């Protein structure tokens, strides 16, 4: 499994490197004045086309930086973490994160955000076995007004649900339910805001205590009822040619163990096209400023997001 993830990352990195295309060069022959006029016309048309394409890509990049934008997207997020446990083990996670908007009426949208983790974990203990499998699904629904507030804020609120489908090593083994909220503002190329949720376990098995966790970790420790809080502040800058530079934290507080997990991710993304398909490629570095005992030290992220604008 680890080999497959590494191979996938290599291929996606190659796509990221070559997908921006090569510049084209006009050939010259025949009458100088005629060709100069034609070239000027073509240059003007190409420049106009390039400007329009760049503007369209930047607009899509701006939408993508909004977690509750009314746009279908399909992110495939590869995460690599290292330094886990006594063996300094590696962990690979592919998060499949489809986003679907639904129009409720003239004023409101419902945004569905799903996270399905596929995990490969080297044994963090000496003599242990490596484990691969899926984790629990985290399903969020945001009821969001179509129009921003008078001050330009975009917001959404709704329920978050943890669905226990994961392999035994990666599941909380119980349904989880709680509130989720997001608020953000977009102006002058900047996007900034925060996403928050909290999940309580609602049907823990008899051999587990209640889980109290906001956005439960995909590799939960102990058999407890979920009780966890997740906080994701973010800031991004989108350039006119659709580059995005962002900084985000994905902080979790486990109320059972009284422990914080505080990774901060610095990333850069480029929105481009493969044929007519708009795709965003992102690479990032993650550092854990705080983690439970045996938690990871640092990690990497690579995301390919396919966009389906209306």
Predicted regions and their residues:
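Intrinsic disorder and flexible/low-complexity segments
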Residues: 2, 18-19, 32
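Bacterial N-terminal signal peptides that target proteins for export
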Residues: 2-11
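Bacterial N-terminal signal peptides
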Residues: 10-20
